[in-house]
C-alpha cells in the first residue's frame, strides 16, 4: 500500500464532531437528560450537541437506561501521521493544499466576515485538522441497562448485571447465539437495549471502504486522535478571524458572534437570530423537570397518607368524641412509628427541595439573556399544623366518596366539588362545665351524659337550676315543625303549605308578574308587621323561593342581596346573608319545563334557620350595558315591542318565605326582664331572683344561638338585644342594664365565661 497516499489522504481531515460517551453512570441519576458531571454540556450550541453518540446517550438516558456496558475489538490497525504539518518551515515548504481549499481561501479576501468564514471554510472543511490517529476497523456490542427494571424482574439487580456481562463476553465466540438470547431478554423485560457496531475493514484483505474516513478511524483510550486548529495553515492576517469565526460557529451555532468581555462570554446575536443566546430546548426540558419534581413532591405527601404507619395512626384515634387540633397533636407525638416515618419524609423533602433549588438556579441562569421569563414557584412544605388539620379533615370530611376541609372554629366542613355530602356526623365535645361527659351512642353529635352540676336536656348539657321546660312558657322554641334537613328539603320541593309564612309584599320599584328592566338596582321587601297584627308570635325562616321569568335569549343573570331584620326595625338593623361563605348555603336555580322561568330556592335548614320580621331583597344584574341602553328611571311600563331592549327584561311571578311561627308571651317575658332590671338597680341582689336569672340566661343563649355565621375570630350578632328593643319596647339604657346583670350573674355566680357578641340593634 502506498503510505504516501494515505498521509496525503488524511492530512487535511477535518474533525467536525466531538463524541463523548460515559462508560458508566450511576443508576441513581435523575431523569434529566444530563447528570451533574455533564453540566458543562447543558448549552445547546455547536456540533457536539447534534453528534450521533451524544444523541444516543441522551435518548437512552431519558428512557431510564442509566448504565452502559460495551465490549469491542479492533482490526487492521495502522498508525498515520500528518507529515506535512510537522514541517516547521511552512514558508519555504508550503503545505500542499487541495485546489478547492486554496480557492476558498482566496475568495475570503483580506477582511472576511464571520459568516463568510463559516459558509466558505468551516461548514465545508470544519475547524480542526488531523495530526495523528489510528486507522482500522472496530466490532462492538453495546448494552444500555435499566437496573431498576432488572431488580423488579429478577429480584437482584447485581446478579442480573453479572449474568448479562457473562452472556455478552461470548459475543465474539458465538455472535448469532449471543444476539438471539440478548434480543429475547430485551423483548421480555424491556430492561436492556442492545446495539451492534461494525465499522472499517474487518480483515486485512478488505479495503473497499477506505475512502470513508469516519468508518476506519478508531476512537478508544488506546487509539487517541490528535487534532490541531485549522488556523495554522491560514495566512497570519486570517488566523485571528478564523478563531473568532470557529468559536462563533461552535458556541453560537453560526447565529451570532462569540464575544468575551470582563470575564464573561456571550453570543452577540445576528438580526435574523435574536434568540441565539437562549437555549430554548434546555429551558423547556428544565421546566418539564421542575414540573415533574413538583408532582413528585405532592406524591410524597400522598405516600405518607397511604403508608401503614399513617393508616394505623388514623385507626387508633378515638372516634367516640370530638378531637381538637391540640388533642390530635398529642396522639401524633406519642406515635413513634409515625414519627420515624415522618422524619424520613422530612429528610426526603429536604433533599428534593435542594434538588429543585439547584435546577431552578440553572434554569434562571440559562434564561438571563432570553426573552422567555421562566415561571417557577418552589413547592411549599406542609407544616405540622397543616398535617394536623389534614388529619381532622380526614376524620370528619370524608363521607360518601366526597372530601373537604374541616373548619374547627365553625365545626363544619367546606366540601370540594360544589357538594355538601362530605361531612360526617361531628361528635360532641367532651370536657368540663357545660361540655359533655360522654357522647350519645344513638347520635354521636349529642351529649349522652353531663358533668356534675349539669343535666342533659335535648342532647346538650345545661345547669341543673335551669328549667328549660319553663322557658317554653315565654317562647315556644320547640314545635312540631322541627323536621330533619332531608325532610325540610323534601317539603320545600313539594311547597308544603305547613311551611308557608304569609308575608306582605312591598316595593315601590317593581310589581309582581310584570316585566321590568333589572339593569338598575331594584328593591322589594317581605314583612310580617308582627308588632301590629301578630304580637303573640315571633317567626323563623328556614328557606326562600322566587320564580323569575326571562325573555328568550336573555343574557341577564340576576344577583340577589338579602338583608334580614330579625325583630323589625330599620334597614340598618338588619344583617346580610353571606351566601356561600362560612358554610352558608347558596341559591339553587332550577329551570321549569317548557318555560323561560326559573325557580330560585334557598334552603337554610335547621343549621342556619334564624328569626325574621322583614326580608329585604336587592336585585341587580351581572350584565354591564352601555348608557344608551339603560332605562334611566327604571319605573313605568316597559316597551316589549322594542327588540333591542326586551331581551333584558325579567319578571318575578312569585316570591315566598318558608318557615314557622313560635308562640311568644311578651307580657310574661317583660315582667321577668323588669325583675332583673330591678335587682340590678338595687345593687346586685342576684339571689332574690336566681331562677329568673337562670331563665333569662337560657333564653338569651337559645336566641343568640340562631344568629347568622360570622368570620372566624369575630363575635356573633346580639339578637337578644334586638328582641328586647323591638318586641318588648325597652330603652337602650334598660337593655344595657339587663345584659350587664346577666353577664355578672353568669361570671360571678355560675363561674362561666361570657361569649362576646356584636351589637346589631
UniProtKB/Swiss-Prot annotation:
Residues 68-251 form the MACPF domain. Plays a role in neurogenesis and brain development. May suppress cell cycle progression in postmitotic neurons by inhibiting G1/S transition. The gene is BRINP1. Glycans are attached at residues 156, 433, 443, 553, 599, 631, 677. GO terms for cellular component: cytoplasm; dendrite; neuronal cell body. Belongs to the BRINP family. Keywords: Cell cycle, Cytoplasm, Glycoprotein, Growth arrest, Neurogenesis, Signal. PANTHER family: BMP_RETINOIC ACID-INDUCIBLE NEURAL-SPECIFIC PROTEIN 1, MACPF DOMAIN-CONTAINING PROTEIN. This is BMP/retinoic acid-inducible neural-specific protein 1. GO terms for biological process: cellular response to retinoic acid; central nervous system neuron differentiation; negative regulation of mitotic cell cycle; positive regulation of neuron differentiation. The lineage of its organism: Eukaryota, Metazoa, Chordata, Craniata, Vertebrata.
Amino acid at each position: 500500500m502506498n503510505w504516501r497516499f494515505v498521509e496525503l489522504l488524511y492530512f487535511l481531515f477535518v474533525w467536525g464532531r466531538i463524541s463523548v460517551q460515559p462508560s458508566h453512570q450511576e443508576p441513581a441519576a435523575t431523569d434529566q437528560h444530563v447528570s451533574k458531571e455533564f453540566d458543562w454540556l447543558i448549552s445547546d450550541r455547536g456540533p457536539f450537541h447534534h453528534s450521533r453518540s451524544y444523541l444516543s446517550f441522551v435518548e437512552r438516558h431519558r428512557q431510564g437506561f442509566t448504565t452502559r456496558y460495551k465490549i469491542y475489538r479492533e482490526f487492521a490497525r495502522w498508525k498515520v501521521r500528518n507529515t506535512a504539518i510537522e514541517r516547521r518551515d511552512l514558508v519555504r515548504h508550503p503545505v500542499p493544499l487541495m485546489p478547492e481549499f486554496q480557492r476558498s481561501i482566496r475568495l475570503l479576501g483580506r477582511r472576511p466576515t464571520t459568516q463568510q468564514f463559516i459558509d466558505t471554510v468551516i461548514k465545508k472543511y470544519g475547524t480542526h485538522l488531523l495530526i495523528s490517529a489510528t486507522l482500522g476497523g472496530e466490532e462492538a456490542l453495546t448494552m444500555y441497562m435499566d437496573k431498576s427494571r432488572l431488580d423488579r424482574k429478577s429480584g437482584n439487580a447485581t446478579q442480573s448485571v453479572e449474568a448479562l456481562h457473562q452472556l455478552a463476553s461470548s459475543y465474539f465466540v458465538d455472535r448469532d447465539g449471543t444476539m438471539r438470547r440478548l434480543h429475547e431478554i430485551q423483548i421480555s423485560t424491556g430492561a436492556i437495549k442492545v446495539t451492534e457496531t461494525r465499522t472499517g475493514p474487518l480483515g486485512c484483505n478488505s479495503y473497499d471502504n477506505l475512502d470513508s474516513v469516519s468508518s476506519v478511524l478508531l476512537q478508544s483510550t488506546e487509539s487517541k486522535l490528535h487534532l490541531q486548529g485549522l488556523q495554522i495553515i491560514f495566512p497570519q492576517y486570517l488566523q485571528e478571524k478564523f478563531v473568532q469565526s470557529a468559536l462563533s460557529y461552535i458556541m453560537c451555532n453560526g447565529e451570532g458572534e462569540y464575544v468575551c468581555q470582563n470575564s464573561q462570554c456571550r453570543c452577540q446575536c445576528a438580526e435574523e437570530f435574536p434568540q441565539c443566546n437562549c437555549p430554548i430546548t434546555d429551558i423547556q426540558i428544565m421546566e418539564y423537570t421542575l414540573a415533574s419534581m413538583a408532582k413528585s413532591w405532592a406524591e410524597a405527601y400522598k405516600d405518607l397518607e397511604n403508608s401503614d404507619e399513617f393508616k394505623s395512626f388514623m385507626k387508633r384515634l378515638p372516634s367516640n368524641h370530638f378531637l381538637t387540633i391540640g388533642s390530635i397533636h398529642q396522639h401524633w407525638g406519642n406515635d413513634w412509628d409515625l414519627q420515624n416515618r415522618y422524619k424520613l419524609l422530612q429528610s426526603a423533602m429536604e433533599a428534593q427541595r435542594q434538588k429543585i433549588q439547584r435546577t431552578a438556579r440553572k434554569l434562571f441562569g440559562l434564561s438571563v439573556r432570553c426573552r422567555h421569563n421562566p415561571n417557577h414557584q418552589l413547592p411549599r412544605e406542609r407544616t405540622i399544623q397543616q398535617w394536623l388539620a389534614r388529619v381532622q379533615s380526614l376524620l370528619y370530611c370524608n363521607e360518601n366518596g366526597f372530601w373537604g376541609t374541616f373548619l374547627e372554629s365553625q365545626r363544619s366542613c367546606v366540601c370540594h366539588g360544589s357538594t355538601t355530602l362530605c361531612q360526617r356526623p361531628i361528635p360532641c365535645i367532651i370536657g368540663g362545665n357545660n361540655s359533655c361527659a360522654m357522647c350519645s351512642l344513638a347520635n354521636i353529635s349529642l351529649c349522652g351524659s353531663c358533668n356534675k352540676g349539669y343535666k342533659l336536656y335535648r342532647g346538650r348539657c345545661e345547669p341543673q337550676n335551669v328549667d328549660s321546660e319553663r322557658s317554653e312558657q315565654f317562647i315556644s322554641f320547640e314545635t312540631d315543625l322541627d323536621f330533619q334537613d332531608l325532610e325540610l328539603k323534601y317539603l320545600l320541593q313539594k311547597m308544603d303549605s305547613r311551611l308557608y309564612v304569609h308575608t306582605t309584599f312591598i316595593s315601590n320599584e317593581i310589581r309582581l308578574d310584570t316585566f321590568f328592566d333589572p339593569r338598575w338596582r331594584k328593591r322589594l321587601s317581605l314583612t310580617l308587621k308582627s308588632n301590629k297584627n301578630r304580637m303573640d308570635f315571633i317567626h323563623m325562616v328556614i328557606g326562600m323561593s322566587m320564580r323569575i321569568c326571562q325573555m328568550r335569549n336573555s343574557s341577564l343573570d340576576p344577583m340577589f342581596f338579602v338583608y334580614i331584620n330579625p325583630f323589625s326595625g330599620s334597614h340598618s338593623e338588619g344583617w346580610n346573608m353571606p351566601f356561600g361563605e362560612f358554610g352558608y348555603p347558596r341559591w339553587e336555580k332550577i329551570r321549569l319545563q317548557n318555560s323561560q322561568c326559573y325557580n330560585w330556592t334557598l334552603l337554610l335548614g335547621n343549621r342556619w334557620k334564624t328569626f325574621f320580621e322583614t326580608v329585604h331583597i336587592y336585585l341587580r344584574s351581572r350584565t354591564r350595558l352601555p348608557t344608551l341602553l339603560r332605562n334611566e328611571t327604571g319605573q313605568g311600563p316597559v316597551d316589549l315591542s322594542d327588540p333591542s331592549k326586551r331581551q333584558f327584561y325579567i319578571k318575578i311571578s312569585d316570591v315566598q318565605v318558608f318557615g314557622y311561627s313560635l308562640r311568644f308571651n311578651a307580657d310574661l317575658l317583660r315582667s321577668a326582664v323588669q325583675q332583673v332590671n330591678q335587682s340590678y338597680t338595687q345593687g346586685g341582689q342576684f339571689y332574690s331572683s336566681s331562677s329568673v336569672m337562670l331563665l333569662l340566661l337560657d333564653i338569651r343563649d337559645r336566641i343568640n344561638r340562631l344568629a347568622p355565621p360570622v368570620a372566624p375570630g369575630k363575635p356573633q350578632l346580639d339578637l337578644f338585644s334586638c328582641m328586647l328593643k323591638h318586641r318588648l319596647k325597652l330603652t337602650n339604657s334598660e337593655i344595657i342594664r339587663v345584659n350587664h346583670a346577666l353577664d355578672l350573674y353568669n361570671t360571678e355566680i355560675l363561674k362561666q365565661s361570657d361569649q362576646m357578641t356584636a351589637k346589631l340593634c
